[in-house]
Amino acid sequence: MKNVIIVCGLNGAGKSTLGKVLAEKLNYRFIDMEDIYFPKDDPNYMYSNPRPFEEVERILLNIISENDSFVLASVKGTFNKEIVSHFKCAVYIETQKETRIKRVYERSYNKFGERILEGGDLYEKEKAFFDFVKSKDENTVEVWLSSISCPIIRVDGTLPIGNNAELIAEKLGNQF
């Protein structure tokens, strides 16, 4: 039996950060969808060449076949039925829009520095991404969550990561 826990939430919610801590706590592998979508084939900008969705699904199915238990960080899990059937639990990180936008900007600045500022070589690309994050429908994850049948654990994305990981592990212990 596969134990795939999807940690979902909008950009900047804290999926990767919480997912890594949770995976370590549960002794599961951690997978970040960002790493699957964006191959590291451009050393100057890691988001240059996104993979087609069908290829992403193939890679994810291979990961599922090779691993019994892992935590998957993804905005939402709108994948084919075969993939979704392996989700044993969804963790939804609820985080206010202002906090998320601030985190996204800080993360980009920490990765790319002044290259994201006006006049920098990544300014246009990052500005387009920031605009995308700001315009994203706040209910998009909620709508997806209503379509799945596995248990959903909701956590506050502004609480300490360790506290959220402990809460999730406790709830998972009661469910599995």
Model region roles, listed by residue range:
Residues 2-4, 68:
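Pre-Walker A (Motif I) flank of P-loop NTPase domains
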Residues 16:
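Walker A/P-loop
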Residues 20, 24-62:
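Conserved substrate/cofactor phosphate-moiety recognition/catalytic segment
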Residues 86-107:
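Conserved phosphate-donor/acceptor-positioning beta-strand/loop module used by diverse small-molecule
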Residues 113-164:
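Small-molecule kinase domains that catalyze NTP-dependent phosphoryl transfer to phosphate-bearing small molecules
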Residues 13:
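ATP-binding Walker
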Residues 7:
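Hydrophobic anchor at the beta1->P-loop junction of P-loop NTPases
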Residues 10:
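P-loop (Walker A) phosphate-binding loop of NTP-binding proteins
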